[in-house]
Design a protein with these regions (language model features):
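Short, acidic loop-to-helix structural element flanking the phosphoryl-transfer center
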Residues: 60-64, 78-83, 90-122
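Acidic/histidine-rich alpha-helical segments that form the ligand environment
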Residues: 264-267, 320-360
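Active-site neighborhood of HAD-like aspartate-dependent phosphohydrolases
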Residues: 1-47
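Alpha-helical bundle segments that constitute or directly flank the non-heme di-iron/ferroxidase center
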Residues: 243-271, 294-298, 305, 379-382
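Asp-based, Mg2+/Mn2+-dependent phosphohydrolase catalytic module
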Residues: 1-4, 107, 111-112, 127-128, ...
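A metal-dependent, Asp-based hydrolase signature
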Residues: 42-91
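Short, contiguous alpha-helical
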Residues: 273-319, 348, 360-399
Length: 399
């Protein structure tokens, strides 16, 4: 089984965003003209959108970033104008359908993928409310209530946007880090292909004009029309579709995605995070406590030691018993997530400030032997992935 991540606009749905966005902005400004000057509103909305695109912090959803940058400068309180916005998406946004083009081949390809036992997910840029994304899927003939997409991102549930590779890491983390081959399918060289490649994903570039249009980094990726996707997959060696999260950019994206995805996975859960899925298994809350303490007492001190000392010795630490000795089962899981997010930000800031050569600094590990900082970060990322999978499976079991 392969998981296909599909871009939406100009991949599954004909939609030239350079033409769509100005009309969208004008329509929204007209609807909100009673509460904000249209010119100022459009300018402020574009600024707020940039804040979403540039967000690299896992402690704020894109919706939270947008709200903070959009409503206060306009002197608005969201709750007081939510009715106007809801009316826009219910009455005005559907009229923009005429700017888009239905692509029957997109419906056919997605249907074939589902029928053959592969999975499809929508990897559109989550800069819109969920309703705007669901409506565009409907225009594409791929209504969410009829197609079993494994994921449809939106600004309510995501913390990162394209071209940040952390978007793709968060996407996969929210799916429990699938162990299947994964392919990103999209038309945009930077947002789809370049960003997915930074994480280490296989890609297929939707391109109607041939290889001469390639101006991205690295070798020209596999490309063609949407109808060429399945023949390409069937002719590809499995190893070419495997993920590879090992470059510094990919590892930082994974580390950034962990607290973000855990926040979404645990948000508004009806079960208690301290509830164990089975006897002898950790609860989601215990996992969050574990991640917090390992980052605080093991990972961050080790990273500092490797940078500040010459080929230091790193003692092995058995952290699993902490769950019992520190009574994680009695602790507040959501508070543990908040604390983990804070220390993870310290880890990220530390790593991002390092020159490239410092990733090669050596150390001696009690268990792994001779190692270097790059390998240590790789171990942290792998540890993250295992525990995100654990939380994902626990929540699924408890629900």
């Amino acid at each position: 089984m392969t998981l296909l991540l599909f871009d939406l606009d100009d991949t599954l749905l004909g939609n030239e965003m350079n033409a769509f966005i100005p009309v969208y902005l004008q329509a929204l400004a007209k609807r909100m003209a009673t509460v904000a000057d249209p010119t100022v509103l459009i300018k402020t909305l574009m600024y707020a959108t940039r804040q979403m695109v540039e967000n690299s912090s896992p402690d704020k959803t894109l919706e939270e970033k947008f709200d903070a940058a959009f409503y206060p400068p306009l002197g608005l309180i969201r709750s007081e104008v939510q009715g106007i916005i809801d009316a826009f998406y219910a009455e005005d946004f559907p009229k923009l359908r005429g700017l888009t083009q239905f692509r029957p081949e997109a419906v056919s390809v997605v249907e074939q993928i589902i029928q053959r036992g592969d999975q499809a997910a929508i990897a559109t840029n989550p800069l819109f409310p969920r309703t705007a994304i669901l409506q565009r899927l409907d225009w594409a003939g791929l209504a969410a209530e009829h197609v079993p997409f494994t994921m449809i991102p939106s600004y309510e549930t995501f913390h990162f946007a394209k071209p940040n590779p952390a978007f793709f890491a968060e996407f996969l983390a929210q799916l429990g880090w699938p162990k299947t081959p994964i392919v990103m399918v999209g038309n945009d060289i930077e947002l789809d292909i370049g960003a997915a490649r930074q994480l280490g994903l296989a890609v297929f570039w939707i391109n109607h004009n041939g290889a001469s249009m390639w101006n991205g980094q690295g070798a020209i990726p596999p490309y063609g029309e949407l109808t060429d996707l399945l023949p390409w997959m069937d002719g590809s060696e499995p190893k070419h579709l495997q993920t590879n999260y090992t470059t510094p950019n990919a590892l930082l994206a994974v580390l950034r995605s962990t607290p973000a995805a855990l926040a979404t996975l645990t948000h508004k859960q009806e079960i208690k995070l301290e509830q164990r899925p089975a006897e002898g298994e950790w609860s989601p809350g215990e996992v969050l406590c574990h991640l917090r303490d390992v980052d605080t007492e093991v990972n961050l001190p080790r990273l500092y030691k490797v940078i500040n000392e010459q080929n230091p010795f790193l003692a092995g630490v058995d952290t699993d018993p902490w769950a019992d000795t520190r009574q994680y089962c009695q602790q507040d899981g959501l508070q543990a997530l908040t604390d983990f997010t804070l220390v993870r930000l310290e880890v990220l800031h530390f790593l991002e400030a390092l020159p490239a050569e410092d990733w090669n600094r050596n150390a001696r590990h009690a268990i792994f032997g001779p190692t270097h900082l790059h390998e240590l970060v790789n171990i942290i990322a792998g540890h993250d992935i295992l525990h995100v999978q654990q939380v994902y499976e626990a929540l699924k079991s408890l629900n």
